[in-house]
Design a protein with these regions (language model features):
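Conserved beta-loop-alpha segment that forms the PLP phosphate-binding cup at the N-terminus of a helix
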Residues: 76-79
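Multi-pass membrane proteins that catalyze or facilitate reactions on polyprenyl-/lipid-phosphate substrates
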Residues: 1-72, 83-277, 281-395
Length: 395
């Protein structure tokens, strides 16, 4: 498989930056080490790194991949990393980008899990998080502003985005919101097309349904042990949409209520560790795997929960260019994109309410937003400064 160059899917004017696998690895190792704040913040950092600074992708290409990442199961920010690696270096880049983005968080979470098993408690990191969260909000606001200016091409798409945001605030499921956004965005073109000629469905995006069914069946029938642990987490990675709170519900049903491998306190501690460490929240699996099966369990659980994402992205990489060649399908993709941004905006608002709790955090958020939007300061320095301030002020 030859690498897919960024210009191929988006046409003239797209970046054609050539990069090595080593450069892909180094960039995603860096991002995996500093990417605090959950998927919205991770995606914001990737937009700044790969669209604004390195110009590996156009903003339109980035938005297309973001739309698909929100449509397929699994961790959206990890899938974005895999997409970008695939764009620049084909299948090798897909593996390298995904693995190097996951690796720092997995190592950190594994170390915390080791201390947790030994001492029965979590390290105290409240001071660092106190100052870090407002900076994360600023990073998300910066990305949302830049992406929205590109994605909302018409007044109708703006209305679709507003409908999606209100629906999400009313707790409508994310996948249903994206489906409705796609239908609404494509409706005008679809109506005109149906008036002139019969139309086959534009596209279907139900990746690997048989494989997902096999994973679910196997996870409920395999014997106890590391193999069963692997299948449980593969099932979760193959069917999970949504946030870390959705992950909590899946793991509660399987590991606490079903298999009785964890207590509720251990599960909540595991999700907390996934939230406070950099990189994908799904490295919660690393923590749980270590508690259940030591180092082998941590490795097996991590591979299991992330493996479906690599497969889904590899398949979706063939779909995106075909979607863009169809006028109606492209319009529906635009709907998915603005729907995804609407979800991102509502999540940013929810996170801001939790992060900005007093005058110092409000000042940090405002100053960070101004530095990012007006002076384009690298978010890495803001994160480092905020972490140090929080440690000294509240540690």
């Amino acid at each position: 498989m030859h690498p897919i160059r960024a210009g191929e899917a988006a046409g003239a004017g797209a970046p054609t930056v050539e990069v090595s696998l080593g450069e892909v690895a180094l960039v995603f190792l860096k991002l995996g080490t500093i990417a605090f704040g959950g998927p919205a913040a991770h995606i914001a950092m990737m937009e700044d790194e790969f669209v604004t600074r390195r110009r590996w992708l156009t903003r339109e290409q980035f938005l297309d991949r973001l739309g698909v990442a929100n449509l397929i199961p699994g961790p959206s920010s990890t899938e974005m990393a895999i997409f970008i690696g695939y764009e620049k270096r084909g299948w090798a880049g897909l593996l390298v980008a995904g693995c190097t983005f996951i690796l720092p968080a997995a190592i950190i979470v594994g170390a915390i899990a080791s201390a947790y098993v030994r001492y029965g408690t979590l390290p105290q990191v409240n001071g660092v998080l106190y100052a870090l969260k407002p900076v994360v909000i600023a990073v998300v606001i910066q990305a949302f502003w830049k992406l929205a200016r590109t994605a909302v091409k018409t007044a109708w798409l703006g209305i679709v985005a507003l409908i999606a945001a209100v629906s999400y605030a009313l707790r409508v499921h994310e996948v249903l919101i994206l489906a409705i956004a796609a239908i609404l965005a494509g409706a005008p073109l679809l109506y005109r097309a149906l008036r002139t000629r019969p139309l086959l469905p534009a596209f279907f995006l139900t990746p690997m349904t048989p494989a997902r069914a096999v994973a679910i069946f196997a996870a409920t029938s395999a014997p106890f042990g590391l193999w069963r642990l692997f299948l449980v987490f593969t099932k979760v990675g193959a069917v999970l949409f949504g946030s870390g709170y959705v992950l909590l519900a899946f793991l509660q049903a399987d590991l606490v209520d079903g298999l009785h491998w964890l207590t509720e306190r251990q599960l909540l501690d595991a999700v907390a560790v996934g939230q406070i460490t950099p990189g994908p929240v799904f490295t919660t699996a690393t923590f749980i795997g270590y508690i259940i099966g030591g180092t082998p369990g941590a490795i097996i659980a991590t591979i299991g929960i992330f493996a479906p994402a690599f497969l889904f992205v590899g398949i979706s990489g063939f779909v995106i260019p075909r979607i863009r060649r169809s006028t109606i399908a492209a319009a529906m993709m635009d709907g998915v994109v603005v729907g995804s941004l609407a979800l991102m905006g509502v999540v940013a608002w929810q996170l801001a309410r939790a992060a900005i709790i007093d005058l110092p955090t409000l000042v940090i958020a405002i100053v960070s937003t101004a530095l990012l939007l007006r002076f384009r300061v690298n978010s890495v320095w803001l994160i480092a400064a905020a972490g140090a301030f929080g440690w000294l002020y509240r540690g």
